[in-house]
Amino acid sequence: MKFSNKIKISWHDTDAFRCVRPSKIVEYMQETANLQCVDSGLPLDDLRDEKGLAFILGAMSISIYKPLHAYEEVEVRTWCRETKSYIFNRYFDIVRGGEVIAEAASTWVLIDLDKKSMVRADNYDFFGGKFYYDEPVAADSVPKKVRIGKDAELNFVGERKIAYSDVDYNMHMNNTHYPDMVCDFLSELADEKNPCRVKELSLSFIKESHLGATLKVSRSEMDGDGNILVRTQNEEGETCLEAMICLEAL
């Protein structure tokens, strides 16, 4: 079965064209995952404070089949499969009126915060057997790994400083904020003459973006299929994020 969380969408979650922003969709999904941990008996704060461990997101792919709007009531669901490696695979969907209108797949690793090392996921059963649900998953249900080649034609479009409102207790940008940051550099999403929305979004998290860091943001031109590539790099020139966004007309 899937763990379920019912929500009513806030007006403040929507963009210039009255569609829910991708960052809010990711937030709905990840808050539902957090609630599953609470329901299973070990909130993420306790996992960190009592066991010195934290989940770190490696990659996430989201498909938004239809736009969401203010005050709609939806059901957000999440599930994961038991793992025999270092990787946790977690899945999500959002249901409106009995119809699945968004889906996502994500990969996570468990980190020992003191040792700064990965922990095998199958070494622990923190959640008393309640964490894993026997839900079928398609063989290809894995997040798309975004890898932008060195020969990709990207143009520098601006800088973004990581500030107070971006970070969580890990002191780096919370991963639910990345879609907003990426979309802030897509002028297409603010074109009143040609309204559009994000249909798909794939994020590969390569290096954390810490409080106070200034990221350089580069992007490609939109191709014929509506795809745009985005890369962020820190002051040392290290790549922090690579993303692919697909837009469609409204």
Q: How would you describe each model-predicted region?
A:
Residues 1-57, 105, 112-197:
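Hot-dog-fold acyl-thioester-processing enzymes
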Residues 2-5, 63-143, 205, 209-214, ...:
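HotDog/MaoC-like acyl-thioester-processing domains
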Residues 53-67, 196-208:
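Small beta-barrel nucleic-acid-binding modules, principally OB-folds
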